[in-house]
């Protein structure tokens, strides 16, 4: 077990995980690991290689030759696929709608989980995703399960898309999120589920600062000797 301090934040799509995790990491001076970005990058890699998303073995073979890395950036950290920056490209609708399938492949998860654990074992981390508290960092000192209503999550995604010049109507986003929730919670390998020792935090109707404050108090309590 690592002697570093590990904070796991899990939850469904658009619950606010990455937004909250980034702020906490900055405040605590911890390393932020966006595991979802790793799966998204692999999804984009498959697309760029001309692979069908259903080609599990092809995706697994490609992963062995794929380097995924992060670099600090403002306002968000930068993501690289081999030597190309893909920070924006991995947020496309096509990647979003296919990442659950790529993430369901056993060998893909095993490889990326190993990479994620290597990072967590060398420094203090905040890691967010779907299975951090249950699979990736089962011994994390703090586990948070972040949730929000489907409508609120769709509205958040709508605002994000609009800011990027992308137009997808609210009802479509609601449907996409419900579909993603089902895929994530029903996959055979590491489904989205609240760890038994995770603390549930509902962000519906809450400001970002209120959620950050609530989780900061949880962390401080755990850090007391």
From Swiss-Prot:
Keyword Kinase set for record: yes
Localisation per UniProt entry: Cytoplasm
Enzyme Commission (EC) number: 2.7.4.25
A GO cellular component entry from the record: cytosol
InterPro entries per the UniProt record, alphabetical: Cytidylate_kin, Cytidylate_kinase_dom, P-loop_NTPase
A GO term for molecular function: CMP kinase activity
GO biological process: nucleobase-containing small molecule interconversion; pyrimidine nucleotide metabolic process
Keyword Ligase: no
Listed Gene3D superfamilies: P-loop containing nucleotide triphosphate hydrolases (3.40.50.300)
Catalytic activity: CMP + ATP = CDP + ADP; dCMP + ATP = dCDP + ADP
Keywords of the record: ATP-binding, Cytoplasm, Kinase, Nucleotide-binding, Transferase
Main localization category: cytoplasm
Enzyme class: transferase
Annotated Pfam families: Cytidylate_kin
Chain sites annotated for binding ATP: 11-19
Family named by the database record: Belongs to the cytidylate kinase family. Type 1 subfamily.
PANTHER family given in the database record: CYTIDYLATE KINASE, CYTIDYLATE KINASE/PANTOATE-BETA-ALANINE LIGASE
The protein's name in its UniProt record: Cytidylate kinase
Gene name in the database record: cmk
């Amino acid at each position: 077990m690592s002697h570093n301090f590990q904070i796991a934040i899990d939850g469904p799509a658009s619950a606010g995980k990455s937004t909250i995790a980034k702020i906490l990491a900055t405040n605590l001076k911890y390393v932020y690991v966006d595991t979802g970005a790793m799966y998204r990058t692999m999804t984009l890699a498959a697309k760029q290689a001309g692979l069908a998303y259903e080609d599990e073995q092809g995706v697994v073979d490609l992963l062995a030759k794929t380097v995924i890395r992060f670099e600090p950036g403002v306002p968000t950290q930068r993501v690289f696929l081999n030597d190309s920056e893909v920070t924006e490209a991995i947020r496309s609708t096509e990647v979003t709608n296919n990442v659950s399938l790529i993430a369901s492949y056993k060998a893909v998860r095993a490889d990326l989980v190993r990479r994620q654990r290597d990072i967590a074992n060398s420094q203090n981390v905040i890691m967010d995703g779907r299975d951090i508290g249950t699979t990736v960092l089962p011994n994390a000192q703090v586990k948070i399960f972040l949730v929000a209503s489907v409508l609120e999550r769709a509205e958040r995604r709508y605002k994000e898309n609009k800011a990027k010049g992308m137009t997808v109507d609210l009802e479509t986003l609601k449907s996409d999120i419900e579909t993603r929730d089902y895929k994530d919670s029903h996959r055979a390998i590491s489904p989205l589920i609240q760890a038994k020792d995770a603390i549930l935090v509902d962000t519906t109707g809450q400001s970002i600062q209120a959620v950050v404050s609530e989780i900061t108090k949880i962390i401080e309590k755990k850090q007391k000797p």
